[in-house]
């Protein structure tokens, strides 16, 4: 689906930024449906970062190896694992009637904390 690919591209572009995700501008347009897809893309991205930190190869975002390697160099493994747990919880709560924009902001800030050591 073109919309799905475009959203994945947008999320990956945000996660790839050397200076960290631009939390407010990215999160402004996130609704509940987009939040669910965002959490999924973030989970697969974080899994690839953890794999790189453990001297393995990325599994999900093989088209983004240079960006993943750059992020993995600065990321701390314990923070990535904490972020992975937070994303797992977010995925469980995505159907909850919370404010999707605020949830997206929170997750992107947590990502920045994990990858901008």
Language model region names:
Residues 1-117:
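Charged, glycine-rich active-site and insertion segments that engage polyanionic ligands
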């Amino acid at each position: 689906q073109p919309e799905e690919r475009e959203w994945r591209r947008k999320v990956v572009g945000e996660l790839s930024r050397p200076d960290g995700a631009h939390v407010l501008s990215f999160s402004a347009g996130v609704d509940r449906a987009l939040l669910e897809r965002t959490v999924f893309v973030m989970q697969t991205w974080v899994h690839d970062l953890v794999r790189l930190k453990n001297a393995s190869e990325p599994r999900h975002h093989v088209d983004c190896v240079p960006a993943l390697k750059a992020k993995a160099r600065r990321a701390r493994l314990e923070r990535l694992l904490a972020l992975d747990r937070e994303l797992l919880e977010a995925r469980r709560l995505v159907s909850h009637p919370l404010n999707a924009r605020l949830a997206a902001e929170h997750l992107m800030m947590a990502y920045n904390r994990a990858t901008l050591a």
